[in-house]
Every structure is written in C-alpha cells, then in structure tokens.
Design a protein with these regions (language model features):
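Phosphate-binding/catalytic loops
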Residues: 2-4, 93, 99-180
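Conserved active-site segments centered on acidic
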Residues: 2-90, 163-170, 175-178
Length: 180
C-alpha cells in the first residue's frame, strides 16, 4: 500500500472491534499516545469503531477506562460508533482486532482498495502467537489489563512500521503491510 503524505492530510488509522467499548478504544488511545509522544500527532490520526451498533454513543466500558487509566492513558472522551462502508473513505488503514472483524470488514469493502486497507492488529507483531485479541467483555477485570498489554505491544509495532513515513521530508508512505 502506498499513499502520499502531506501536512494537510494526516495518515488516518481506525481500529475496529465488536462494540467499540473495549478493545478498539484501547488501541485508539494507545496509538494516539504514541503519535503525540513521538511528535507526529499532527501527521497521524486515530479513531475506532465497532462492527455492531449496540453501544453507539456510549462511553467505553468502565473496565476499559480503568485499565487505560492504570497505565497512564485517558480514554474518557471516547464515545462508541459503528463502522460503515463510508468509514473506508476517510481512513488509510483499517485495523481489525480479531479475524471475525477482519472477515466482516473485507465483506463490507466496496473495492479492492478498501479491502487492501484491512489488517489485523496482532499481525504487526514480528512473531505473533495468535492473530486474535480476545474480547474481555465477559471476563474478569484482570483480563482487561492483559488485553491492554497485547494491544500496547502490537500498536507499538504498528507505529514503528509507520513512523519512518511520518518523519519530516517523507512524502510517501510505502507500507510493508496491507492485506493480511
């Protein structure tokens, strides 16, 4: 995947899970933190969405917000939204949190270009032991911390792959990833 970057058009990443109240908000917040901490906050933007509409307009799950806060992140401004086919148009990379989301997103893709934007978050790790970030929604609170750890590792790996294209003077981002 290749995309021209300029100061007026940040590279846009959307993270997608089921209800947009647990996993994808974690990834969005962590990615935004990495972008801001690296000085690239103006050149990259992150958002999140869910494949379902059950929680549209709601805040993140309280256990999600607590896990983020324990690690020094602020997810308090998050409001759940649903991914639609139009979401492909405003994003450069669509990151699925598990293979079921990946299948759904590829099914919603209207073009090959849309489908090529879809990648699995754990696929950015050098040697993933799984490709699915487990859904902590029905699990104990500790699972939220474990899931956040997985998301942090994979999001850091994703950002490391993206970061060279965000440096001043870089006009084109050619990514070693794309369709997974």
């Amino acid at each position: 995947m290749t995309r021209n970057l300029d100061a007026s058009a940040p590279f846009r990443v959307v993270f997608v899970c089921t209800g947009n109240i647990c996993r994808s908000p974690m990834a969005e917040v962590v990615f935004r933190h990495l972008a801001d901490a690296s000085g690239h906050g103006a050149r990259v933007a992150s958002s999140s969405a869910g494949t379902g509409d059950w929680h549209v307009g709601e805040r993140g799950d309280e256990r999600t917000l607590a896990a983020l806060q324990r690690r020094g992140y602020d997810g308090s401004r998050h409001r759940a939204r649903q991914f639609t086919a139009d979401t492909f148009d405003v994003n450069d990379l669509v990151v699925a949190l598990d293979r079921s989301h990946e299948r759904i997103l590829r099914g919603w893709a209207r073009t090959e270009e849309d489908a090529d934007k879809v990648a699995l978050l754990l696929g950015f790790l050098p040697n993933p032991t799984t490709l699915d970030v487990p859904d902590p929604y029905y699990a104990a609170t500790e699972m939220f911390d474990d899931v956040l750890g997985m998301i942090e590792d994979a999001t850091r790996s994703l950002f490391r792959q993206l970061e060279p294209a965000l440096r001043p003077g870089s006009r084109t981002a050619a990514f070693p990833f794309g369709a997974s």
